[in-house]
Curated annotation (Swiss-Prot):
One of its GO terms (molecular function) is ADP binding. It catalyses: (2R)-3-phosphoglycerate + ATP = (2R)-3-phospho-glyceroyl phosphate + ADP. PANTHER family: PHOSPHOGLYCERATE KINASE (PTHR11406), PHOSPHOGLYCERATE KINASE 1, CHLOROPLASTIC-RELATED (PTHR11406:SF23). Belongs to the phosphoglycerate kinase family. The gene is pgk. GO terms for biological process: gluconeogenesis; glycolytic process. It is an enzyme of class 2 (transferase). This is Phosphoglycerate kinase. Pathway: Carbohydrate degradation; glycolysis; pyruvate from D-glyceraldehyde 3-phosphate: step 2/5. It comes from Vibrio campbellii (strain ATCC BAA-1116). Pfam families: PGK (PF00162).
């Protein structure tokens, strides 16, 4: 995909408007998880060092649009940036009618959702944002699937609209995994329901050489293979859909599973062959044989796309499947991309962050990209590159 990259532009003396993803958790006025800010720092530093007049903004939380609310202010982010960049960073509350900035200066523009018309991508607001800058930088992949004034509209009216390093890297990594993957390509889709991941499964079934399913999703496929799943979470109305997918793509179905009688952290895991699952059993994880089989598939993969754990990994007795998959991905020499909240939690839990080629920053945007949907912000950047 062809977009203008911020790193290819001369930014000296230019007014640069960066739409970042600084939507971080805040408690008692302090940022409690700084991952998104840290991810945005290289983009901000690059602009400052290039001698640009830098404005950065984001949404934070879900305020009532058009109304200021202190609990959703970006002030805690400004305080964090002051320390992280070791320079004075100001917060601008009223900025829509223009700002005066010096080269090498950074101003944070208050929460975009305090501006009426932001979510509806209103043209008037988009033009006001665009009038503030010479160059618009879209660097928030996490909101690229939303057509809003600060992610889409502004880019249609700014003199130049480009992709920031974070967004460019994300598009490159996902493109490498999805568009022309090195083969064999293995996709892992976990989660509780087939219904919430159906489009993802359908999209990946056309690309992947092997499609691995886990979690509650796997139970529907076990049922589709003709086995009893007891009281396990599964979707009877999607069994036929699962069968159709199994006809279209190689989907290895578990041969053994870890069961219990109740959804309880302290429940003992009982390993059973899938043909031995009883009516009162609940399947919470893959068994050791199935995990080993999947690990072998991953060992030979040249491309791996991972979205979702394969069991209730939060419970010690049912973490083995996800742990085994994690370790196999970490050991693989193939190119691996992982995304989704639960997936990131599993990566942290099993300490494999350094061994995954690319970890996506976008939840909903990651899924929509994998579904094959066009992301409005990316479509805008492509249009502006022509």
């Amino acid at each position: 995909m062809s977009v203008i990259k911020m790193t290819d532009l001369d930014l000296a003396g230019k007014r640069v408007f960066i739409r970042a993803d600084l939507n971080v958790p805040v408690k008692d006025g302090k940022v409690t998880s700084d991952a998104r800010i840290i991810a945005s720092l290289p983009t901000i530093k690059h602009c400052l060092e290039a001698g640009a007049k830098v404005m950065v903004t984001s949404h934070l939380g879900r305020p009532t649009e058009g109304e200021y609310a202190e609990e959703f202010s970006l002030q805690p982010v400004v305080n964090y940036l002051n320390d992280a960049l070791d320079c004075e960073v100001k917060l601008a509350k009223d900025y829509l009618n223009g700002l005066e900035l010096n080269a090498g200066e950074l101003v944070v523009l208050e929460n975009v959702r305090f501006n009426k018309g932001e979510k509806k991508n209103e043209e008037e607001l988009s033009k006001q944002y665009a009038s503030l800058c010479d160059i618009f930088v879209m660097d928030a992949f996490g909101t690229a699937h939303r057509a809003q004034a600060s992610t889409h509209g502004v880019g249609m009216h700014a003199d130049v609209a480009c992709a920031g390093p974070l967004l460019a890297n994300e598009l490159e990594a996902l493109g490498k995994a999805m568009d022309k993957p090195a083969r064999p390509m293995v996709a892992i889709v976990g989660g509780s329901k087939v219904s919430t991941k159906l489009t993802v499964l359908e999209s990946l079934s056309k690309i992947a050489d092997q499609l691995v399913v886990g979690g509650g999703i796997a139970n529907t496929f076990i049922a589709a293979a003709g086995h009893n799943v007891g009281k396990s979470l599964y979707e009877a109305d999607l069994v036929e859909t699962a069968k159709k997918l199994m006809d279209e793509c190689a989907i290895p179905v578990a041969t053994d599973v870890a069961c219990a009688k109740a959804f309880d952290e302290n429940a003992e895991a009982e390993i059973k062959h899938v043909s031995e699952v009883q009516d009162d059993d609940m399947i919470f994880d893959l068994g050791p044989d199935s995990t080993a089989e999947l690990a072998e598939i991953l060992k030979n993969a040249k491309t791996i796309l991972w979205n979702g754990p394969v069991g209730v990994f939060e419970f010690k007795n049912f973490e083995a499947g996800t742990k085994g998959i994690s370790e196999a991905i970490a050991a693989s020499e193939g190119f691996s991309v992982a995304g989704g909240g639960d997936t990131l939690a599993a990566i942290d839990k099993f300490g494999i962050k350094a061994d995954v080629s690319y970890i996506s920053t976008g939840g909903g945007a990651f899924l929509e990209f994998v579904e094959g949907k066009v992301l409005p912000a990316v479509e805008m950047l492509e249009a502006r590159a022509k």
